Amino acid sequence: MKEIDKKKEKKVEVLITTVDCKDFNGLLKKMNIQTNAMIGNQTSYNKIDSIDYNSLTIPVYSFNERGVGLNRNNLLMRSKADYCLFGNDDLIYVDGYENIVNKYFCKYPDADVIVFNLDEKRKTRFVTEKDFKVNFFNFMRFGAARIAIKRESILLNGISFNTCFGGGTKHNNGEDTLFLSSCLKQKLKIYAVSQTIAFLSDDRESTWFQG
């Protein structure tokens, strides 16, 4: 794949969703964050703050609310990046993920969404072995933690996460597929690629059903 001129690389931001986080710097380090990021922390209080991390200023939005879709929407509406990754707090990103995201949006210039692979010790998720275009017949196999979006395409088409579905709501899942379904209904272009973007860690108690 053709290398991208560093000066022409577009900005990638990781939108990190977590629940009751007490150590934000530790979270960023554990996730191997190398770019701009934002943290949405669903907890028992309301506070907007920022932390310094590896010469970056990372905004932290702590809100007394629940629902992973709501958490992602709160971050998405505040992002200014060209491309966004939806970062669950159990992900460990590969080195150079910003360059990887740029490479695949360069490879597929009409793409609005790129779906990457997630690596895990026990394979439970669909693994893309050869790049293909995502459509209404195959989109339900993918979750939000493995996708990168062209932020402007999502916002211009009025797409967001359904706040009635997903962790922390009455319906504990489904917000991922509803999001991708909305993208397809708006005729956005989605590609699944064989590149791994992150690893799933298994060293914490999941907060998925809390928020």
Show the residue positions of the predicted features:
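Glycine-rich, basic loop-to-helix element that forms the pyrophosphate-binding segment
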Residues: 62-79
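Catalytic beta-strand/loop signature of glycosyltransferases that borders the donor
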Residues: 161-163, 187-199
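Conserved nucleotide-sugar donor-binding
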Residues: 81, 143-160
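N-proximal low-complexity "stem/linker" segments adjacent to membrane-targeting elements
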Residues: 1-38
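Acidic donor-binding loop at a coil-to-helix junction in glycosyltransferase catalytic cores
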Residues: 166-178
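Conserved donor NDP-sugar-binding/catalytic core segment of glycosyltransferases
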Residues: 92-128
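Active-site acidic Asp-centered loop
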Residues: 42, 87-90
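Short aromatic/hydrophobic "clamp" motif used to bind/position activated sugar donors
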Residues: 84
